[in-house]
Regions:
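Active-site neighborhoods and metal-handling regions in enzymes and metal-associated proteins
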Residues: 2-390
Length: 390
């Protein structure tokens, strides 16, 4: 990390594709499929934002982007001209823009491509790395962002309900395989039904977790093949609104038919751990404190924490992951509810998702989304969290 050599104000330098670079999209509110450059120049007590992008996108950017100036690389061509490579030309234009503005110091976050640092330094500009700058700015959600998350979670709950009812209301073949519309009900069929429903609601959906049986003892097992009666099925859905770009994230566990006694016990422990975690969440509490409350609750219920050792019996049952994470434009954002998790801030959106996993049985997980408040948290979920979805 560079050390400033003078006291002059520093400019922010960022570059990326807004459709996939969430921090740039969050800052400018404008999505495009090619790399853009965002430069924020010190001005008075604030800054002036310049967006550099392809000339064919300038009209839309002037209409929709939250910036003060829109330009293309040709507007900041250096004396030797621009490269024929688009990203190199962007880096050259960024350095020239900073040079013309008299900037001697700039900073970027953890996502700034090295080529931009190199061209800026060639122009005599010191570039500092501030890896957490945008991370910290994005943690506290505005009322508008919370409204987007609330709506995304509402729709996500609809998808969860669809999947859990489809499983719970299926018929069972003599060998225990679930049947629906004359064919075996598989994880793939449930996943497809969820995808189609969410598409109609205006959401894009990454590969949902529809994980039944022993395979679900891996907490991130997506689930494949036929679903069976009497086995817990973890349903974890995390879609993104196509318009707002904000995500929902919710998990429930469903069992078709008779629920095994051990699954009932695991579910009660998971539910109690979630309650224990949510009781700790408030402004100033740490993500680590929340996670330790989850672990303490699991241990009090008779379960372990940590991945199984190589010689562990298949009946070993434990929570194997953190308690939760931040959520927003990205489905996984800081902070973590885990060891070394930081102090929580007002307005942060978090998932709370304890789970238990057993190799010979599968897994049980419950996940809600909460908003951190001064004295506690607001749970955005309204869906029941039981095992019977008939």
């Amino acid at each position: 990390m560079s050390t400033p050599s003078d006291s002059s104000p520093r400019a922010r330098l960022a570059a990326g594709i807004p459709s996939v670079h969430s921090s740039i999209y969050w800052r400018i509110g404008f999505s495009v499929g090619d790399q853009v450059v965002l430069i924020e120049l010190p001005k008075g007590n604030g800054s002036e934002a310049t967006l550099i992008l392809r000339d064919i996108e300038m009209g839309r950017a002037r209409q929709y982007a939250r910036v003060d100036q829109v330009a293309c690389p040709a507007d900041f061509a250096p004396a030797g001209g621009l490269s024929g490579d688009r990203e190199t030309a962007n880096a050259q234009a960024a350095a020239e823009c900073l040079r013309r503005a008299g900037v001697t110091h700039a900073y970027g976050d953890r996502t700034l491509p090295l080529i931009f640092v190199d061209y800026a330094r060639q122009a005599g500009i010191v570039v500092d790395c501030e890896p957490d700058r945008w991370v910290n700015e994005r943690r506290q959600k505005s009322p508008e962002e919370i409204a987007h998350l609330r709506e995304a979670q509402r729709v996500t709950e609809g998808a969860i309900q669809l999947a859990c009812r489809l499983i719970a209301r299926a018929s069972a073949r003599a060998d225990g395989v679930l049947m629906h519309d004359g064919a075996p009900l598989t994880s793939e069929r449930v996943r497809a039904a969820v995808d189609h429903w969410l598409l109609d609601q205006g959401y894009v959906n990454p590969m949902s977790i529809i994980a039944g049986g022993p395979g679900a003892s891996d907490c991130h097992f997506y689930g494949y093949g036929e679903l069976r009666t009497g086995q817990p099925v973890i349903v974890d859905i995390f879609p993104r609104n196509r318009a707002s770009k904000y995500n929902g994230d919710c998990t429930r566990t469903v069992v078709h038919g008779e629920i095994p006694a051990e699954v009932v016990r695991m579910h009660a422990a998971v539910r109690a751990a979630k309650v224990a975690a949510e009781k700790v969440i408030k402004v100033g509490a740490t993500g680590e404190a929340v996670h330790r409350a989850t672990i303490a609750s699991m241990i009090a219920s008779g379960y372990a924490f940590g991945l199984p050792k190589a010689d562990a019996p298949t009946s070993y049952c434990a929570m194997t992951h953190g308690t939760g994470h931040g959520i927003g434009i990205d489905v996984h954002e800081p902070p973590l509810l885990d060891i070394k998790g930081p102090a929580l801030l007002a307005g942060e959106a978090l998932t709370v998702e304890p789970g238990l996993y057993r190799q010979d049985l599968g897994g049980v997980r419950i996940e809600d989304m909460v908003i951190v408040t001064q004295d506690g948290c607001e749970n955005l979920n309204h869906l029941p969290d039981g095992l019977d979805w008939k």
